[in-house]
């Protein structure tokens, strides 16, 4: 993918690995896969979710600044509603990705190994990263399709498939891992039922299983009644904290969590071990769990910061988006439930008639959220916290941020200039090519001479127009250099055939008195010394 990510097959011939180089020593031989899976829940909670969050922050910061500086028809494109539709999820996704990331690494800090949260976090954050980068490319448009040192999105765009694929491909994580594992590991009764069924003492196991099973049935009935009552009441029967005007969201989350719990129980009881083959159902249930998790993470993130009021539009956008996604995922699971006879009862329990009206954020809230990454406010700084920022005109990101600052500082001057140009006769301006790239100085001199711009405003205006033109330019390369680069790249790439499989070495006989194997004790230093000696022509 033309990205610095070392990934591929590894093989060797007569490779010797000293025992001291084996993780865990001799006791852990043959247990590498187990150790890998145990560590995966930790690494998967940190690396790729952080990558997705960072990419989302960068995309929102740079694209919001670019949208402000890019003008069309005499207006910033950030004022166009079509562009705002792309800027809106950029800001919202960056906010909720960061909230979910912090919630999950907080579990790691407490010594928890969150296998299910890490799986859904990796899946969702990398998926939102893909959406964010695609939205950013839509806004940047032609400015983003030429790869080169000026392009601040190309590398992130190229790296998206890697993040989607590694550490558990998203398509399998969604359809198999998140709900398939979570439904069993997180259920209050399933694990105990399995343990009772495996009990070597059949009498004791049957007695334990009966007690747990009846508790499971009562749990399912309670979930059904709770889902029905909360569904009809719109969650109003649930006691919720009265903080920061979030009561409606708490109630909807309580209502849908009851529906999710009921649907989980019914799925396990009716589908059982066939859940692995019902990957569409498992995927929709995973989407429901993801929406519940991210909505909870957003509320906690805002709470931990003390409910700053300027973040409320972003919080509401994230909650409304996740609740709408949660509703759609649960409805899809109910409408396509693999046992047709249960579809109508589940629909009445989870979605009482006339009590489902969630449609996601409206246009008014969307415009406010889009402005969060366009306007120079503390909210924009908070959203981009931790993101590398500079205003170096020779840097791909710094070029955009420098033009953004100069454009904001001279906005009133440029508005005055544009208004004067619109009022002038075309014949008067016929000798001036109003192209910022070619005759900026002539245009500024004309504006100063006409009294439109003062002498003190000349240099700031010229600097801003220069930066605004420079941020629009794409990279241009000499054809001969491109040809040499292509030939060099082609020459460095060579298809390597996989080595033929070798016969496994015969296992040595153990010593009869100890049962251990006769293994020559060697160290890495000894092997290095022997290798160097073999290459010494004088040896």
Residue ranges and their predicted role:
Residues 2-506, 511, 521, 528, ...:
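Flavin-dependent oxidoreductase catalytic core characteristic
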Residues 514-517, 523, 533, 538:
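Acidic/Ser-Thr/Pro-Gly-rich, low-complexity N-terminal segments
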């Amino acid at each position: 993918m033309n990205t610095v990510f070392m990934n591929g097959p590894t093989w060797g011939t007569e490779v010797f690995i000293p025992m001291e180089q084996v993780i865990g020593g001799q006791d852990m031989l043959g247990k590498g896969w187990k150790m890998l899976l145990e560590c995966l829940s930790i690494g998967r909670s940190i690396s790729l979710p952080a990558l997705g969050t960072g990419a989302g922050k960068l995309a929102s910061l740079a694209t919001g600044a670019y949208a402000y500086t890019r003008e069309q028809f005499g207006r910033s494109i950030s004022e166009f509603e079509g562009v705002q539709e792309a800027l809106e999820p950029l800001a919202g996704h960056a906010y909720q990705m960061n909230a979910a990331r912090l919630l999950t690494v907080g579990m790691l800090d407490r010594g928890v190994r969150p296998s299910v949260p890490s799986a859904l976090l990796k899946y969702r954050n990398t998926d939102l990263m893909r959406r964010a980068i695609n939205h950013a490319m839509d806004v940047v448009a032609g400015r983003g399709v030429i790869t080169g040192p000026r392009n601040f999105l190309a590398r992130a765009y190229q790296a998206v498939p890697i993040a989607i694929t590694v550490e558990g491909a998203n398509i399998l994580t969604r359809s198999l891992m998140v709900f398939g594992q979570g439904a069993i590991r997180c259920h209050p009764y399933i694990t105990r039922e399995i343990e009772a069924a495996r009990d070597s003492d059949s009498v004791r196991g049957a007695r334990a299983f009966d007690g747990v099973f009846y508790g499971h049935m009562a749990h399912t009935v309670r979930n059904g009644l709770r889902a029905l009552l909360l569904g009809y009441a719109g969650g109003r029967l649930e006691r919720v904290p009265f903080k920061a005007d979030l009561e409606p969201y708490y109630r909807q989350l309580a209502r849908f969590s009851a529906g999710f719990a009921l649907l989980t129980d019914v799925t396990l009881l009716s589908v059982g071990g066939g859940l692995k083959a019902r990957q569409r159902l498992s995927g929709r249930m995973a989407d429901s769990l993801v929406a519940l998790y991210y909505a909870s993470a957003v509320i906690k993130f805002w709470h931990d910061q003390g409910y700053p009021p300027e973040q409320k539009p972003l919080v509401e956008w994230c909650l409304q988006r996740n609740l709408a996604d949660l509703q759609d995922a649960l409805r899809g699971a109910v409408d396509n439930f693999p046992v047709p006879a249960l579809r109508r009862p589940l629909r009445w329990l989870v979605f009482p008639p006339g009590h489902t009206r969630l449609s996601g954020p409206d246009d008014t809230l969307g415009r406010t959220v889009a402005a969060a990454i366009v306007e120079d406010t503390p909210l924009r700084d908070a959203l981009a916290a931790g993101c590398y920022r500079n205003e170096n005109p020779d840097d791909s990101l710094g070029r955009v941020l420098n033009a953004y600052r100069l454009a904001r500082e001279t906005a009133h001057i440029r508005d005055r200039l544009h208004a004067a140009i619109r009022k002038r006769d075309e014949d008067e301006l016929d000798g001036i090519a109003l192209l910022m790239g070619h005759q900026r100085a002539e245009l500024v001199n004309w504006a100063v001479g006409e009294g439109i711009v003062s002498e003190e405003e000349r240099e700031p205006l010229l600097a801003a127009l220069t930066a605004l033109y420079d941020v629009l330019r794409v990279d241009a390369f000499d054809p001969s250099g491109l040809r040499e680069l292509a030939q060099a790249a082609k020459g460095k790439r060579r298809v390597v055939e996989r080595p033929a499989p070798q016969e496994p070495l015969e296992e040595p006989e153990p010593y009869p008195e100890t049962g251990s194997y006769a293994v020559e004790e060697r160290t890495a230093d000894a092997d290095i010394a022997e290798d160097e000696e073999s290459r010494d022509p004088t040896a």
